[in-house]
């Protein structure tokens, strides 16, 4: 049973500009240390960051909440699963909200093409 659905799309240039403007401050605010290390290994780090950003925003939207709840995007970590699929792990406020809603996992799809990265998340 689906508890919540979220979709997000972002331009690669938006993420590139944020990295160029705020640098490590932006990276540390949005991405976990593991995600940052993984991005360095990617053939297109900007696209990788953009997909992760879209994924985190899509997951955020599955909860139907606002930022006043105190959530942080670093409370969502997206790693590669056994078959390369994006596998999110939630901690902090996100983990508490997930438990309160009776959800057991988040299904996530990420993609990019040209100048756009897109994500769809389902809370189940």
Residue ranges of model-derived segments:
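Core catalytic alpha/beta fold that binds nucleotide/phospho-ligands
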Residues: 1-124
């Amino acid at each position: 049973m689906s508890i919540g659905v979220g979709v997000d799309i972002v331009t690669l240039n938006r993420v590139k500009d944020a990295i160029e403007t705020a640098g490590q401050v932006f990276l540390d605010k949005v991405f976990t240390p593991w995600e940052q290390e993984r991005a360095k290994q990617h053939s297109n780090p900007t696209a990788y960051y953009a997909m992760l950003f879209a994924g985190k925003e899509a997951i955020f939207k599955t909860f139907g909440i606002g930022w006043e709840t105190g959530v942080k995007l670093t409370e969502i970590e997206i790693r590669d699963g056994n078959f390369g699929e994006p596998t999110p792990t939630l901690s902090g406020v996100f983990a508490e909200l997930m438990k309160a809603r009776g959800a057991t996992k988040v299904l996530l799809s990420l993609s990019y093409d040209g100048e756009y990265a897109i994500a769809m998340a389902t809370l189940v």
